[in-house]
């Protein structure tokens, strides 16, 4: 039985969700409409202009506070990865695999597998440069086409690994917060869906590549583009590089073992990975700079913070709007929820279940579509909170597990916008393989569409 009716504040919230979706479809920046929505809803709820103006600042403080652990871990991972690249340790980690590239088939799966592993721990951006420098020349000699190499890097890194984000947990944090559920629930629910999506898509892409390769009498050869002259001035001695290249992955594997052993999830897991990254950064840093180490470390942190806030700058305003629909209402607006309300999104979900027949099929399709729409800006992250919010709405109406729908929306958003279908998100992989990003997006479309269809059907069966 409904405890609270649909009030003007609910109508305003739905209106601005629609406006945000429209802005995304038109590929417009969502920051203005998100903040304008917070202002108008606050003005209606508080009847105070000064409180409404203050709510804009409070919304940033609230959203940043919720996201700060995630932002920081991205900063520290990027700082560490930058130093590992400059010292040659990253190259030492994967150079042994170059000798395993025997033909185009092994090249595709080896590039994909390594890109997946690197992206889980360091995110895809460092992986593109690293594999471009070490593995792509070997793949080219083995007969892998430029487009196939770009597809492997893209689908395994920016799609398969990033859509689950099991180690860093930036994506699950955003969607879980918007859905009002623990991060661990989203991670657990996403594991089978991420595997289904990843295996289906990469296999479909491989089949397409093999068919096209058989049609080509003379496969295209290529030399990967590297970003300028390689600077070896900070390279550590070969023996030390090899030792650290062995110990650093071991440290992160130990972190994963601790997560499983002590059931660490959410911020606890984030803290363990982030702390390990800081320790590795300090250790390698003192090997490189020795007595000058204290003078150099700040620069790496600054570069990491620049990257982290560049990625999450567009995320904070839209996340603030969706926090308003759940746990952040009172903190942001400084006023209580309407009597009997369980949060704007919960109320809307209950109302939706009374207004129209709801089905698992409709809910899963809606979440896949919502996720895809949020990815149209090419980041995969800026609108991902929308998927979590809609998942909560539909799960309330269905009385179903919100984690499954949340995971489905997350997967759809990141596969589309994180860098497999939106051309401007494909530029790094396309550039290093010397292919057109629009052609890469076109080749990715069929495998990703097949994957999303199969994953949506799987989610329906899991609900």
Curated annotation (Swiss-Prot):
The keyword Transcription regulation does not apply. It comes from the Bacteria. It is a multi-pass membrane protein. Keywords: Cell membrane, Membrane, Transmembrane, Transmembrane helix. The keyword Hydrolase does not apply. GO terms for cellular component: plasma membrane. The chain crosses the membrane at residues 6-26, 31-51, 60-80, 101-123, 130-152, 189-209, 242-262, 269-289, 304-324, 413-433, 443-463. It is found in: Cell membrane. This is Uncharacterized membrane protein YhfA. It comes from Bacillus subtilis (strain 168).
């Amino acid at each position: 039985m409904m405890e609270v009716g649909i009030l003007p504040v609910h109508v305003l919230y739905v209106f601005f969700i629609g406006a945000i979706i429209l802005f995304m479809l038109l590929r417009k920046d969502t920051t203005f409409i998100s903040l304008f929505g917070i202002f108008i809803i606050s003005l209606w709820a508080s009847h105070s202009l000064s409180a409404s103006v203050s709510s804009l600042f409070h919304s940033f403080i609230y959203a940043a506070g919720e996201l700060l652990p995630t932002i920081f871990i991205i900063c520290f991972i990027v700082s560490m990865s930058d130093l590992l690249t400059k010292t040659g340790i990253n190259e030492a980690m994967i150079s042994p695999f170059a000798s395993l590239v025997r033909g185009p088939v092994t090249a595709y799966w080896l590039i994909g597998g390594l890109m997946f592993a690197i992206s889980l721990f360091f995110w895809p951006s460092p992986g593109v440069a690293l594999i471009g420098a070490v593995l792509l020349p070997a793949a080219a000699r083995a007969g892998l086409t430029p487009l196939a190499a770009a597809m492997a890097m893209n689908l395994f890194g920016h799609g398969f690994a990033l859509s689950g984000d099991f180690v860093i947990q930036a994506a699950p944090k955003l969607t879980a917060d918007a859905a009002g559920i623990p991060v661990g629930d989203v991670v657990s629910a996403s594991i089978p869906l991420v595997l289904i999506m990843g295996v289906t898509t990469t296999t479909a892409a491989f089949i397409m590549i093999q068919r096209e390769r058989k049609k080509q009498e003379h496969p295209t050869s290529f030399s990967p583009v590297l970003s300028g002259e390689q600077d070896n001035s900070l390279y550590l001695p070969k023996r030390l590089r090899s030792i650290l290249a062995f110990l650093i992955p071991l440290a992160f594997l130990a972190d994963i073992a601790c997560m499983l052993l002590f059931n660490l999830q959410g911020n606890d897991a984030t803290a363990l990975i982030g702390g390990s990254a800081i320790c590795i950064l300090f250790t390698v840093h003192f090997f490189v700079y020795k007595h000058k180490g204290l003078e150099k470390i700040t620069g790496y942190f600054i570069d990491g913070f620049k990257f982290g806030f560049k990625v999450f700058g567009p995320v904070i305003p839209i996340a603030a709007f969706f926090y308003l629909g759940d746990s952040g209402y009172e903190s942001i607006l400084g006023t209580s929820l309407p009597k009997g309300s369980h949060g704007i999104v919960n109320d809307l979900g209950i109302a939706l279940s009374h207004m129209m027949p709801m089905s698992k099929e409709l809910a899963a399709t809606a979440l896949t579509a919502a996720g895809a729409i949020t990815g149209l800006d090419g980041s995969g992250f800026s609108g991902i909170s929308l998927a979590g919010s809609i998942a909560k709405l539909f799960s309330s109406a269905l009385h179903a597990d919100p984690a499954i729908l949340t995971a489905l929306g997350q997967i759809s958003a990141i596969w589309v916008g994180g860098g497999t279908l939106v051309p401007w998100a494909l530029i790094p992989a396309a550039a290093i393989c010397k292919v057109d990003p629009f052609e890469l997006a076109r080749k990715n479309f069929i495998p990703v569409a097949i994957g999303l269809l199969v994953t949506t059907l799987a989610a329906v069966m899991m609900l």
